[in-house]
């Protein structure tokens, strides 16, 4: 177990605050780089001759690579230096975010933005685990709320900065400019002190060997993904060359093949993980002795923990709704409210920054305050915020008066962002500490692949055919559904927290079969 920060002397607490501030700033910067493209949609479409569907798939490329990469990076963070993983991730995302500004066509922009997702994944998995160890117990939701404030703040700030910088210097300079700070801050992350934790069981060389990355074993491990991607690529080629299909259908065929392959890989992992007695040893020196077992162990933990299942499914629905809304909001505002790109992104940035910051931090404090009376506090805040904010967002999308739009947007965004801090804290609450980063990696993988990776291109596709004013209504509806699913977890979280606590103190704890 990691050392409990509040029990340490004052200077160590202060250092924990410094680490939290640095990691929160970088999380914000990660989302700035992620969402800057949504403030640049009209000039990019004009310059590179793209459609809304293309933009949706470019955004989805980031999400897909982020989702696929965050799981193994979560494992690596549990086994090796989290600060090294986080720092390397910052460098990678900054490099490819900069290169994206040099794109000359759809595929270069698609691939560079996908690579940004790999770096962001490495940082996200390692940084969330570090924050959770610096601030355990009742302070965890507040700390993760501060860390997660980068999601709404960075998201809307990226859109706002993109629009303003584009108006001054063009979309290419805007995209490259927001990448530069990451290079400078990566060095500070590399020098962070990692909270005390169990000694690593593997060297880096052993880690790669245990992953069985030889050609033969790699093929055996990922054959569903290879087949799915190959079939998707073949279908895209046939559509384009033989039937003259549009490039949006080509990309959709390829992405569908990749998605089916990823689903097949998940099924393969679950089937290989199945044991006759349904148990696993959670002791550091037990069966968790290689990275592949760690991944399988995380999947098994999720499948056998009711609250985690609700968190995963609810999180995917919320990711579908929230990230889709943030991504397509500037385009919606430009086309339905008659605003220029600069005006829309500035308005979104100003009010989104205020409401998102207040909502995320308030959610963490409220969840921890309720935690003094009931262990259900984090799940309650997460679900109720969505159930209030979702209907407000539906009303918002029907408004065409800017004087009404702004206050409704601010209130809706406040309630929708209450979810950010408590939900990650809830994942750590019901996941064994030994594999905490791995479970969070699995959570991020699932919610993005099943959430905004689908929402972003789907809304773009529907927008090209029916208009953004109609297509966008599916997004808040998904967020409401996510709130309902999370509310189911209110009934199970106490039992699952008690089981994790008992398992942690046992000599040879095992996962129970429900």
Regions found by a protein language model. Give the residues of each.
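Extracytoplasmic gate region of multi-pass secondary transporters
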Residues: 37-38, 227-257, 306-353, 360, ...
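C-terminal transmembrane helical hairpin of 12-TM major facilitator-type secondary transporters
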Residues: 375-423
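Cytoplasmic membrane-interface "Motif A"-like loop-to-helix N-cap segments
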Residues: 79-90, 368-385
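Cytoplasmic helix-loop-helix junction between adjacent transmembrane helices
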Residues: 112-150
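Helix-breaking motifs and short loop linkers at transmembrane-helix boundaries and internal kinks
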Residues: 49, 81, 102-108, 119, ...
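Juxtamembrane intracellular "pre-TM" segments in multi-pass secondary transporters
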Residues: 5-12, 196-238, 264-311, 336, ...
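Conserved MFS/SLC helix-loop-helix module at the cytosolic interface between two early adjacent transmembrane helices
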Residues: 68-107
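Helix-loop-helix hairpin linking two adjacent transmembrane segments in secondary transporters
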Residues: 147-197, 211-264
């Amino acid at each position: 177990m990691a050392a409990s920060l509040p029990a340490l002397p004052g200077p160590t607490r202060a250092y924990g605050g410094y680490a939290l501030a640095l990691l929160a700033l970088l999380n914000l910067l990660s989302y700035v780089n992620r969402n800057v493209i949504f403030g640049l949609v009209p000039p990019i479409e004009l310059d590179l001759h793209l459609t809304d569907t293309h933009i949706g798939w470019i955004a989805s490329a980031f999400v897909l690579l982020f989702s696929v990469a965050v799981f193994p990076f979560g494992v690596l963070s549990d086994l090796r230096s989290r600060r090294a993983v986080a720092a390397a991730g910052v460098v990678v995302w900054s490099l490819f975010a900069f290169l994206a500004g040099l794109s000359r066509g759809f595929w270069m922009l698609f691939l560079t933005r996908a690579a940004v997702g790999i770096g962001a994944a490495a940082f996200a998995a390692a940084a969330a685990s570090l924050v959770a160890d610096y601030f355990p117990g009742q302070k965890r939701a507040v700390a993760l709320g501060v860390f997660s404030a980068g999601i709404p703040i960075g998201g809307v700030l990226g859109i706002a900065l993109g629009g303003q910088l584009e108006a001054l210097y063009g979309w290419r300079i805007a995209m490259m400019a927001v990448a530069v700070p990451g290079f400078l801050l990566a060095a500070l992350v590399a020098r962070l002190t990692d909270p005390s934790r169990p000694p690593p069981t593997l060297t880096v060389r052993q880690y790669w060997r245990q992953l069985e990355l030889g050609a033969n074993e790699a093929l055996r491990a990922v054959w569903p993904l290879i087949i799915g991607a190959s079939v998707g690529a073949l279908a895209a080629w046939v559509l384009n060359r033989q039937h003259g299909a549009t490039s949006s259908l080509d990309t959709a065929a390829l992405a569908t093949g990749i998605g089916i392959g990823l689903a097949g890989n998940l099924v393969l992992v679950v089937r290989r993980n199945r044991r006759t007695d349904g148990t696993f040893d959670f002791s550091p020196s037990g069966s968790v002795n290689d990275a592949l077992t760690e991944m399988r162990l995380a999947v098994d933990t999720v499948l056998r923990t009711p609250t985690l299942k609700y968190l995963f499914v609810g999180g995917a629905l919320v990711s579908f709704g929230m990230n889709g809304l943030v991504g397509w909001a500037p385009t919606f505002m430009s086309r339905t409210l008659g605003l220029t790109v600069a005006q829309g992104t500035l308005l979104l940035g100003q009010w989104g920054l205020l409401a998102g910051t207040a909502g995320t931090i308030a959610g963490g404090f409220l969840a921890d305050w309720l935690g003094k009376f009931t262990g259900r506090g984090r799940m309650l805040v997460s679900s109720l915020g969505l159930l209030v904010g979702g209907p407000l967002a539906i009303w918002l999308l029907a408004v065409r008066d800017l004087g009404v739009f702004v206050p409704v947007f601010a209130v809706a965004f406040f309630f929708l962002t209450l979810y950010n801090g408590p939900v990650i804290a809830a994942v750590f609450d019901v996941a064994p500490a030994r594999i905490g980063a791995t479970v969070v990696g699995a959570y991020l993988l699932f919610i993005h692949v099943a959430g905004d990776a689908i929402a972003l291109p789907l809304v773009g596709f529907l927008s090209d055919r029916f208009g953004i004013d109609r297509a966008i209504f599916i997004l808040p509806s998904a967020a409401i559904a996510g709130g309902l699913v999370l509310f189911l977890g209110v009934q199970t979280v106490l039992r699952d927290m008690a089981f994790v606590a008992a398992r942690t103190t046992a000599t040879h704890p095992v996962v129970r079969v429900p």
